[in-house]
From Swiss-Prot:
Interacts (via C-terminus) with the large tegument protein/LTP (via N-terminus). InterPro entries: Herpes_UL37 (IPR005655), HSV_ITP (IPR034738). It comes from Varicella-zoster virus (strain Dumas). The keyword Oxidoreductase does not apply. Residues 545-1038 are annotated as: Interaction with large tegument protein. The gene is 21. GO terms for cellular component: host cell Golgi apparatus; host cell nucleus; viral tegument. The lineage of its organism: Viruses, Duplodnaviria, Heunggongvirae, Peploviricota, Herviviricetes. Signal peptide: none annotated. This is Inner tegument protein. Keywords: Host cytoplasm, Host Golgi apparatus, Host nucleus, Virion, Virion tegument. It is found in: Virion tegument; Host cytoplasm; Host nucleus; Host Golgi apparatus, Host trans-Golgi network.
Length: 1038
């Protein structure tokens, strides 16, 4: 596809070529009329903001520079001199270079080629032949030298970054990117700092190597011998997951294996618990890597027994983890947050204390490297912050009911601190790979911080952050820091170059003309080149960098109120009547009269204003408006002063409208609307002042102050912005609704599967740690399988956890939906305000229709919010209260059993019995209260086998050893195949046997503590006595 050409540049070349062809009889210098035409053409180019593709740059350079030099040799205009001497810099300022992260070297080759083109021998010869300087700051020699030096430095930075990326363990270092950017933006490159190719180059380099900063911090922690082996191993896993997943590094695998060998066995759970699958994918990934001693193992192979890393709170007390890095074992930290939210235990208080210290360091950070180092060194990596943010959002937003929450009841100080770390960390990792002194980063920073504050606007108050508190913390570290001094220095250099050109023109006029010749000497401070260049650059400073340019009173003098000299009024009226679009400017002596300025403004600017406000705000209408606005701006710009800044206002309006004529126009925002409206009203005010200074009988009719009631342009402008805003809100809302719908369907499916799963029949097996599941329909003798009880509870807990995770996502989505509703309500108020203003005009229905659309939209969002709230409000999942009760009971029993196994004692065994007794009692009560219709409905559903497979997922079935055909279970303690001929009556002598399991549980304290249990040797002695074995007479009554 052929590259588009720059219209303004090509138009300048064509116009100058036509002037060159029209030269007759070697007329030198050119006539004043022809000179003025050339001045206007060059000035129009100097004001241009259009971009120049690289291919067009090469094609146009030689003929354009040649024609400008030719114009100067025939006119000696300051505009031509400035442009000829500084054309390389002016073109590089407008260069449209497509930088890519994949191949930045291609852009450097193009830059090298362009910098060589502008400094070829023919260019230097043309300048010297016309007595123009080759040493100007933006001229061929200077620009070639600076850009070549910058390219060389960029290549070094790119090579260092590439080497560091390819070999990060040996070549990457903290601060290397900052040093490279500082070198590329040092003072000697100040004059090219604002040029787009420099800005884009820095942006690409930052995105290319910005991730090396957190990587280096993690690598330093891995080599930190003061950290425990488990902590270092977890850092290795995290570093690989975030940065090295594609290419395994052998040396890191060896380092990981050596580190894992140093981890104490007590860091892992017992073998009995290890058979239970981990609850999360991340926990499975960590445990698998540690079990296989390979950081590139992401899951345990089926049938393989793997060690499982501990998550309990005790891991924080056993010197297994370094407390200075609480975020690196994120699963244990989340478990601690869930089990000890108040940080009341020893583990919780220790971790909370270190966490508060980390938060204080984060708040005291003043640069990106300080903030990222603090977070990464503490284990709060990108992934850790993401999980923490999700956890805190779930536990906090669960308390919100229709936008209100009692924060103290739902989040503790410990959770608040970690929530703040998660939010700040997420923002920091998002910004670190784009942080640079570029205009792009200014937009990225503003958009990212604003979007985050809107997304979590209901969460931030609960975290203790005041309005704007998150942005304040980020500003200290990541606020845009453009090099304002470089931009201001560039403006000074431009002024110096303009002064050189003006001095040369003034000298020429003084040498070749005298007062009687009628020559029009340029007035100091009012030259067209000064006005055009500074207007262009000052608008650029303001719009791109937010820098307010210095006020130059000489460039914007007030409109002259003095009456014209005797006899000139009629001449001025006659000349003013000739001014009409699209006539060319014809130089006349009356144009230099200060009292003629009101006539110029009252004709050209009034025509442009009247035409613009009558057009429609669409591509064709904007193009037509730009044509007449540019004509009004350029008419008489060589001699007519910029009174009241009218040309500056026209230039600003042109600059903001021009992008909307492109193939891919920018999004029309409220800021655009207010700026355009303000500029049009300012022009109307200036025109009104000028018209009031004209004689009464020649005053043109000035339209009323432009507004949506009398201006088609403004009415369609406001309507298009409101419609575009509604389109964006609707699109975002639809994406949220689709997400809500898909999540609700997933939750519904999971709940149906659980309903079918618990409707199945569960039967005991010889192994008391396993249970069988079969079809609930009695007529179908269909067994689905046998699983360990631990696996069953873990599978159900995983499903419930997945549903809770989906609800958390939906809660975050609700925050976004509330933001959309607030924006829609604001737009609705604007629509109603505009509808009121236009109620009696023809365009009234436009805004009433838009107001109705916003009203329906807002109501729809409210309906969606109320429906989604039903699923997300509260801690418990609607419809799954019984499942969560089951999981809580199971967790209490399992915890008691684990404690009794680890620390056997009478008290721990009694606790197990009490938990079992309470569980059985609760089950009996549940059976009495359970609705029979519900269970009957669930049992009559189909595909129970699919539900069991879905819930149990890939968990291995338990193989029950059925033993011999007689049913006896043979073990190392029992080798009896049949009990028919065995006399076991002696086992009942002097022994009290409880008849039922319920009695055992109810009498457990008495049986365990109050009764004496038979010892094995006493039982054996009794057996020997019965058998008549001599020598064994010991024994006693129980």
């Amino acid at each position: 596809m052929e590259e588009p050409i720059c219209y303004d540049t090509q138009k300048l070349l064509d116009d100058l070529s036509n002037l060159k062809v029209q030269e007759a009889d070697n007329e030198r210098p050119w006539s004043p009329e022809k000179t003025e035409i050339a001045r206007v053409k060059v000035v129009k180019f100097l004001r241009s903001t259009q971009k120049i593709p690289a291919k067009h740059f090469i094609q146009i350079w030689e003929p354009l520079h040649s024609n400008i030099c030719f114009v100067y040799s025939n006119t000696f205009l300051a505009e031509a001199a400035f442009t000829a001497e500084n054309l390389p810099g002016l073109l590089f300022w407008r260069l449209d270079l497509d930088w890519t992260i994949e191949e930045p070297g291609n852009s450097l080759k193009i830059l090298t080629q362009l910098s060589s083109v502008v400094q070829d021998s023919e260019t230097l010869h043309r300048l010297s032949a016309n007595k123009l300087r080759t040493s100007s700051k933006f001229g061929p020699v200077s620009i070639h030298f600076i850009i070549t030096d910058w390219i060389n430095m960029y290549e070094v930075a790119l090579k260092d970054a590439t080497t560091a990326i390819e070999s990060p363990f040996t070549h990457a270092r903290i601060g290397m990117l900052e040093s490279a950017i500082a070198a590329l933006t040092q003072h000697k490159f100040a004059i090219i700092y604002d040029m787009p190719f420099v800005q884009e180059g820095i942006r690409v380099l930052t995105q290319y190597a910005g991730w090396l900063l957190p990587f280096n911090v993690m690598w330093n922690q891995i080599q930190n011998s003061s950290l425990t082996p488990l902590t270092r191993a977890l850092f290795i896993i995290c570093m690989i997951d975030e940065y090295l997943t594609e290419t395994p590094v052998h040396s890191i695998s060896e380092l990981f294996a050596d580190t894992v060998n140093l981890i104490k066995d007590e860091a892992f759970v017992s073998i009995e618990e290890a058979v239970t699958n981990p609850r999360t994918v991340h926990e499975s990934r960590i445990s698998s890597a540690l079990a296989y001693r390979d950081p590139y193992v992401f899951e345990t192979s089926p049938g393989m027994l793997a060690r499982r890393l501990r998550l309990d709170n005790g891991i924080w007390e056993s010197n297994l983890l370094s407390l200075s890095t609480p975020g690196i074992h994120i699963e244990a930290l989340l478990h601690l947050l869930n089990s000890d939210p108040e940080a009341e235990t020893t583990s919780g208080s220790n971790v909370a204390e270190h966490t508060r210290g980390i938060w204080e360091k984060v708040q005291a950070s003043t640069s990106p490297s300080m903030l990222i180092s603090t977070l990464a060194e503490s284990g709060f990596t990108r992934f850790s912050c993401k999980l923490l943010r999700r956890f805190i959002a779930h536990h906090t937003l669960a308390g919100f009911i229709h936008g209100s929450v009692v924060a103290d009841e739902h989040i503790t100080d410990f959770q608040q601190t970690l929530g703040c770390l998660a939010l700040v960390g997420g923002l920091a990792y998002q910004l670190v790979e784009t942080y640079a002194p570029t205009t792009e980063y200014v937009l990225t920073y503003t958009r990212t911080v604003n979007e985050t504050e809107k997304r979590y606007e209901t969460l931030l108050p609960a975290l203790g952050l005041p309005p704007g508190g998150l942005g304040q913390i980020m500003r200290r570290c990541f606020a845009p820091r453009p090099l304002i001094e470089s931009i201001q220095a560039t403006r000074v250099i431009l002024l110096n170059e303009i002064s050189h050109a003006e001095a040369r023109e003034t000298t020429y006029f003084k040498q070749t003309h005298n007062q009687s010749s009628g020559a029009l000497l340029p007035q100091a401070g009012q030259s067209a080149v000064r006005e055009a260049v500074l207007t262009w650059f000052d608008l650029r400073m303001d719009s791109r960098w937010g820098i307010t340019p210095p006020v130059d009173v000489g460039m914007t003098p007030p409109i002259c109120v003095d009456p014209p000299a005797t006899g000139l009024e009629a001449v001025m009226i006659t000349e003013a009547l000739k001014i009409a679009y699209p006539t060319e400017y014809n130089r006349s002596s009356v144009f230099v009269e200060p009292s003629f300025v009101p006539y110029i403004i009252a004709t050209s600017t009034l025509d442009a204003l009247s035409a613009t406000i009558a057009l429609s705000f669409d591509t064709r209408g904007i193009q037509q408006a730009l044509s007449i606005l540019q004509w009004a701006r350029d008419y008489g710009s060589g001699t007519v002063p910029n009174a009241d800044g009218y040309r500056t206002k026209l230039s600003a309006l042109i600059t903001i409208l021009e992008p909307f004529t492109r193939t891919h126009p920018p999004v029309l925002l409220p800021s655009h609307v207010s700026t355009i409206d303000s500029l049009i009203c300012e022009l109307h005010r200036t025109v009104g002042i000028a018209v009031d200074l004209l004689p009464q009988h020649v005053r043109p009719l000035v339209p009323d102050r432009p507004s949506i009631t009398n201006s088609v342009f403004l009415a369609t402008l406001y309507y298009d912005e409101l419609y575009g805003r509604w389109t964006r809100l609707d699109k975002t809302s639809q994406a949220l609704v689709e997400n809500f719908t898909s999540n609700a369907l997933v939750v519904s499916r999971y709940m149906l599967m659980l309903q079918k799963f618990f409707a199945c029949r569960f039967y005991p097996t010889p192994d008391l740690q396993a249970v069988g599941i079969c079809n609930p329909k009695v007529e179908r003798d269909e067994q689905f399988g046998v699983w360990r009880l631990n696996d069953l509870a873990d599978a159900v807990g995983h499903i419930v956890g997945t549903i809770q995770g989906i609800r958390t996502q939906m809660r975050v989505g609700i925050s976004s939906l509330r933001t959309i509703m607030a924006d829609a309500s604001s737009a609705l108020r604007e629509c109603e305000n505009l509808m009121t203003k236009t109620s009696t005009s023809a365009i009234g229905p436009l805004f009433s229709t838009m107001a109705s659309r916003y009203a329906r939209f807002t109501q729809d969002q409210m309906d969606i919010l109320m429906r989604v709230d039903k699923l997300t409000t509260g801690e418990n999942i609607p419809g799954l209260a019984n499942v969560e009760i089951f999981l809580n009971r199971w967790e209490r029993i399992a915890t008691a059993c684990r404690h009794a196994t680890a620390v056997p004692s009478a008290e721990s065994i009694a606790t197990v019995c009490n938990e079992l007794r309470r569980g059985l009692k609760n089950i009996q009560e549940d059976r009495v209260n359970a609705p029979t219709s519900y269970m009957s409905h669930a049992r009559n559903l189909e595909d129970h086998k699919a539900a069991v497979s879905f819930v149990m997922d890939s968990r291995q079935q338990f193989i029950v050893d059925s033993g011999p055909q007689m049913g006896a279970v043979l073990t190392s303690q029992c080798n009896i195949g049949t009990w028919e001929n065995v006399n076991a009556t002696f086992l009942h002598d002097n022994v009290k046997i409880t008849t039922t399991v319920r009695d055992v549980i109810s009498e457990a304290p008495t049986l365990i503590i109050g009764q004496r249990w038979l010892r094995p040797d006493e039982i054996l002695s009794n057996v020997d006595l019965r058998l008549g074995v001599p020598g064994n007479t010991s024994g006693s009554d129980p």
